[in-house]
Amino acid sequence: MMDVNEIRQYLPHRYPFLLVDRIVEINLNDSIIAYKNVTINEPFFNGHFPNHPVMPGVLIIEAMAQAAGVLGFKSMDKKPEDGSIYYFVGADNARFKRPVVPGDRLQLEAKIIAEKRGIWKFECRATVDGQLACSATIMCADRKI
């Protein structure tokens, strides 16, 4: 398990763009389970949508990518402070199955499916109460900064 203070050691993101609150399970070189608590206080709800708040799909994908980023960094035994960054370089087959709204706990799952020359590919899912909200294949690149 990792709390937000430890997560911040592995992700360069900060408020309002840190979208992982806790890691509940991590299996190095394999998979991760994390979550994001979605509250009405999220800044994006001011405009998306004022009378019917829904978490933007691109931010659900970003949350999955951040969870995958923690898995990648931990699997490589690296941190951003070591001069490495994990760029989000692509998403394939993204599908949205249900809206994510204030009060939801978004569970984020990522599984490594390939790694070659610093390009990592993950099969990702985001669920709420066991219901699929989003799925995508996400690619990230480990690069020196």
Curated annotation (Swiss-Prot):
Residues of the active site: 48
Pfam families: FabA
Catalysed conversion reaction: a (3R)-hydroxyacyl-[ACP] = a (2E)-enoyl-[ACP] + H2O
Keyword Cytoplasm recorded: yes
Gene Ontology cellular-component annotations: cytoplasm; membrane
Entry keywords, A to Z: Cytoplasm, Lipid A biosynthesis, Lipid biosynthesis, Lipid metabolism, Lyase
Main location: cytoplasm
EC nos: 4.2.1.59
Superkingdom, natural source: Bacteria
GO biological process terms, semicolon-separated: fatty acid biosynthetic process; lipid A biosynthetic process
Broadest EC class assigned to this enzyme: lyase
Localization per record: Cytoplasm
HAMAP family attached to this UniProt entry: FabZ
Family, similarity comment: Belongs to the thioester dehydratase family. FabZ subfamily.
Summary of the function given for this chain in its UniProt record: Involved in unsaturated fatty acids biosynthesis. Catalyzes the dehydration of short chain beta-hydroxyacyl-ACPs and long chain saturated and unsaturated beta-hydroxyacyl-ACPs.
Entry protein name: 3-hydroxyacyl-[acyl-carrier-protein] dehydratase FabZ
